[in-house]
């Protein structure tokens, strides 16, 4: 994905932000300017609202600090101690002992306690001590849990092959620590930090991974080898010490640099180059009515948002191990604001609207009741969306193109935003409405005829109907198909896919639809209709002012985007001969099997090997993002070459395939266990840039180009009870992303069920050496050839 495009050429851009009052934040602000000290105090309504929010945030922090014991239990225990001591005789042992004497002397220095009546002073002191003791006990529990979660040998042990040590670890974890906590992020403080690998081992693994690309380049290999040896002798240990210091001080030694320099510092267009798309279903359609489908989606997404706001969204697990939930903070109300040197992720709280884009018009649609904050019903939303679809409002041809600005290079968009929007009294408020929205809903005017057309709609639209800066856009076609267009810096695809799965699971059961395809009326709708109190919140039209200068700029942005769109070669490949159940029977990892098929297909397509990127999730660690799985290995190359030798027997080729799959699985497990190569090298490179420590080896390592970038997004992350027993009608290709290199491929693959594979392949028409259709055919042939080694036909 985008990380593969940019991770090899990070920039040490620094973003300088001045201090100024932002009245849109509705918070008390104090800053020093040339005019002196400036104090901004918002309306009392917002002060009370902020105080209430701060109070509940404080309660959450105390709750997490006391994990795994609920705050109510700790409070009740402390109050029980207070009553016990209060009703105890003056000569009771709880009042008269050496410990109480020491505590009493210490408490005499507490000026607050001196104001408490003497009768209640000792009980209050004991209650405070009890609360403190429980807090220390829970802190010890979290410390032990964090140490337990640092154990990673289970990653290398398959089912049925667990050692006694791992089984004991699992028993202790499940019995004493893994309570059924429903609070979002409840386990966050217990997660271990992402491990910092050993410097020498990382360099050795990097050199081993590069062997296949230097087989006929002896001189270049010797030069790289010398650079690595010099690095380990000279600047390497110094840079490792810098990283070690950051590892000790930060929640995650990598994540902040990763977000800054891989995403926010990059100056290229987001559309195609960074943003990605998702497809809900390949064939299934719960309703053909656009407004109904959109209303149900919005309703379900707002349900998820409210559960995240209340911290009741259930934590995710990988087996017994909890996953980091930090990315979920950025799913809603998040916008990437362009900057000259570096972008900024902006979040907005207390927002109750989404923005709808239809036929070049923009609407502000309330999804929460402005007074009660209750969620609007699907029926209310459908009525509001119907009014948009049937609106006869005029469309300003220049205004309609404004979203094309978000597809422009970031520095260019930053200048345009400042000139025509931020510093324009008429346009600053409409822009703020869009950027503060919960998300953007795009009601497209066309219906795709194929999965390729649908994928292109979600990836980039027509060049001016996606707000690429938003955390995500929900797209609903004229015939009721839907997908998402998502910005990448705030989080990874698995996070948004999990949120979307909650919404789509409801669609699978058709919970919100009537037989004629409209959304159902909820009981509160029926009551309101019967009493004549039913209300539809009419969407507000968002209007911008335009001039000749803006017209030229936006037309230029759109024309450039259209050229880039036309250059994208996309192919969605459905392979139904067999699925992941077949590799399992061959004692091979399904992911490794598919990766070897893509290696064979790429070799047949290009005639040589190139570096291949596969993303691995690092959410087992606090604030973890991803790590690179380097697919190409000496074992994978040996298998691919063997497949091209007719003289070799099927048994010999199958043996090499299994060895290659085992090697890939070992590499994947190393990455997940925090022993990857690329994030460590990237951190060393950032340290060398920041501290101005020159390193030829790191410069050479960062020049790598990932010609084949691959990614798998899990289709099902929710428990089976959330889906119908038969999942065949709900198959999906999941989504995809643009090619990482102009002369390379981007491949997003989906292992759906036990009997189906999907591949979404992208490349550039302008590159004569690539063809998405050709690679798709090579992948299908490779999968069949590999299966034939086992006697399959």
Residue ranges and their predicted role:
Residues 2-470, 479-480, 487, 491-793:
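Long, Pro/Ser/Thr-rich low-complexity/intrinsically disordered regulatory tracts in eukaryotic proteins
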């Amino acid at each position: 994905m985008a990380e593969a495009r940019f991770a090899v050429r990070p920039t040490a851009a620094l973003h300088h932000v001045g201090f100024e009052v932002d009245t849109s934040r509705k918070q008390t602000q104090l800053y020093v300017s040339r005019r002196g000290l400036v104090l901004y105090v918002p309306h009392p309504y917002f002060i009370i609202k902020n105080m209430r929010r701060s109070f509940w945030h404080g309660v959450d922090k105390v709750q997490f600090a006391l994990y795994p014991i609920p705050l109510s239990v700790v409070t009740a225990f402390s109050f029980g101690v207070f009553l016990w001591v209060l009703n105890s005789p003056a000569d009771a042992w709880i009042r008269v002992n050496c410990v109480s004497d020491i505590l009493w002397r210490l408490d005499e220095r507490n000026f607050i306690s001196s104001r408490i009546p003497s009768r209640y002073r000792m009980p209050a002191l004991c209650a405070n001590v009890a609360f403190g003791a429980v807090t220390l006990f829970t802190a010890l529990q979290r410390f032990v849990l964090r140490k337990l979660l640092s154990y990673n040998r289970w990653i290398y042990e398959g089912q049925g092959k667990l050692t006694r040590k791992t089984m004991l670890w699992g028993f202790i974890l499940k019995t004493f620590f893994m309570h059924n906590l429903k609070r979002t992020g409840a386990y966050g403080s217990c997660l271990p930090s992402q491990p910092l690998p050993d410097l020498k081992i990382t360099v050795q693994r990097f050199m081993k991974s590069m062997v296949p690309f230097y087989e006929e380049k002896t001189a270049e290999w010797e030069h790289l080898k010398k650079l690595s040896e010099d690095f380990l002798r000279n600047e390497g240990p110094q840079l490792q010490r810098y990283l070690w210091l950051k590892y000790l001080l930060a929640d995650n030694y990598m994540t902040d640099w990763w977000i800054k320099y891989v995403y926010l510092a990059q100056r290229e267009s987001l559309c195609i180059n960074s943003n990605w798309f998702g497809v809900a279903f390949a064939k299934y359609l719960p309703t053909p009515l656009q407004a109904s489908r959109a209303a149900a989606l919005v309703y379900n997404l707002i349900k998820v948002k409210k559960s995240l706001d209340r911290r009741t969204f259930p934590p995710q697990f990988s087996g017994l191990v909890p996953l980091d939930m930090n990315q979920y903070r950025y799913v809603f109300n998040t916008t990437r604001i362009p900057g000259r040197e570096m972008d900024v992720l902006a979040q907005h709280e207390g927002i109750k609207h989404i923005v709808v884009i239809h036929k070049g018009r923009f609407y502000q649609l309330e999804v929460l009741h402005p007074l009660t904050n209750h969620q609007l019903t699907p029926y209310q939303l459908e009525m509001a969306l119907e009014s948009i679809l049937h609106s006869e409002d005029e469309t300003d041809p220049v205004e309609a193109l404004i979203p094309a600005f978000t597809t422009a290079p970031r520095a260019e968009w930053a200048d345009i935003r400042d000139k025509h929007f931020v510093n324009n009294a008429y346009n600053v408020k409409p822009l703020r409405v869009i950027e503060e929205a919960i998300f953007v809903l795009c009601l497209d005017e066309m219906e795709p005829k194929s999965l390729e057309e649908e994928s292109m709609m979600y990836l980039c639209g027509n060049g001016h109907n996606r707000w690429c800066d938003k955390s995500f856009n929900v797209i609903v076609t004229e015939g009721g198909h839907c997908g998402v267009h998502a910005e990448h810096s705030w989080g990874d695809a698995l996070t948004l896919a999990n949120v979307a799965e909650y919404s789509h699971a409801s669609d699978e059961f058709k919970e919100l639809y009537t037989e004629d395809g409209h959304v159902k009326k909820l009981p509160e709708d029926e009551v309101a209709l019967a009493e004549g109190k039913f209300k539809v919140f009419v969407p507000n039209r968002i209007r911008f002012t335009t001039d000749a200068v803006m017209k030229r700029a936006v037309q230029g942005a759109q024309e450039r985007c259209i050229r880039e769109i036309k250059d994208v070669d996309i192919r969605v490949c459905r392979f139904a001969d067999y699925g992941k159940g077949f590799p399992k029977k061959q004692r091979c990892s399904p992911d490794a099997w598919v990766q070897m098929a893509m290696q064979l297909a790429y070799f047949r397509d290009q005639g040589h090997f190139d570096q291949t990127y596969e993303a691995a999730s690092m959410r087992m660690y606090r604030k973890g993002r991803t790590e690179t799985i380097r697919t190409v290995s000496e074992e994978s190359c040996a298998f691919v070459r063997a497949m091209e030798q007719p003289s070799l027997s099927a048994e010999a080729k199958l043996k090499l395939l299994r060895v290659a799959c085992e090697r890939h699985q070992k590499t994947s497990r190393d990455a997940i266990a925090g022993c990857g190569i690329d994030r460590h090298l990237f951190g060393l490179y950032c340290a060398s840039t920041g501290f101005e420590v020159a390193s030829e080896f790191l410069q050479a390592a960062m020049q790598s180009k990932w010609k084949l970038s691959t990614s798998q997004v899990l289709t099902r992350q929710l428990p089976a009870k959330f889906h119908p027993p038969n999942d065949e009608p709900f198959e999906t290709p999941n989504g995809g992303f643009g090619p990482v290199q102009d002369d390379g491929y981007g491949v997003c693959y989906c292992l759906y069920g036990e009997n189906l594979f999907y591949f979404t392949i992208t490349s550039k028409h302008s590159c004569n050496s690539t063809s998405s259709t050709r690679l798709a055919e090579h992948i299908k042939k490779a999968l069949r050839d590999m299966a034939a080694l086992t006697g399959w036909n």
